[in-house]
Amino acid sequence: MEGTNEGNVFSCAMRAGLYLGGWFILRDSIEMFVYSNVVSVGAVFLLALLSIVSLLLTLYIITKGTDVYKREVLKENVSYFKVLNYGFYLFFFASMIYAVFIFLCLTLFNPEMLSDQKNFYDSVFTQMGTMEGASTEMLNSFKSHYDKGFEGLLSQSPRDVAMNNLFGETTYGFFLCLVTSIFLTKKISK
């Protein structure tokens, strides 16, 4: 009986992870388009809006997926750790899909993806420096931090970038699920 529930955990998590991984890919595709085609300070606000939408859609997918998992697998046996376990698997499967996408992008489709991102931020910092009231010292400080980060990122192999994304997204999901699991453990009302 326990093995069946464990299999169902993976099945439910893989299904929701497919949706979440698809969203991560769509989000990154939009970001890649912005990085390579739009060079303005306004694009930064577009990316910030995309981040907010991404968080909201991620929370929606977690909530809906957990709801299905509670209804189909857990029935009345809902606990914080079971919901947290499900959320971890959901993010792990989504992150695996996303890491494969990143690897394929960096090796086949768009090897210049990270360079485009660096060039985008270089242009934005240059534009911000010409704005009235801009603090040159602060911008130079931010730019030096970005340059160091991108220098490290650009020196990594596509495999390393993909593995770092796998680890990073899974860790992000785990911490997000630590909080969301508190609210998603309530019993199912009939």
Task: Show where each model-derived region lies.
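Short membrane-interface loop/juxtamembrane segments of multi-pass integral membrane proteins
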Residues: 77-80, 130-157
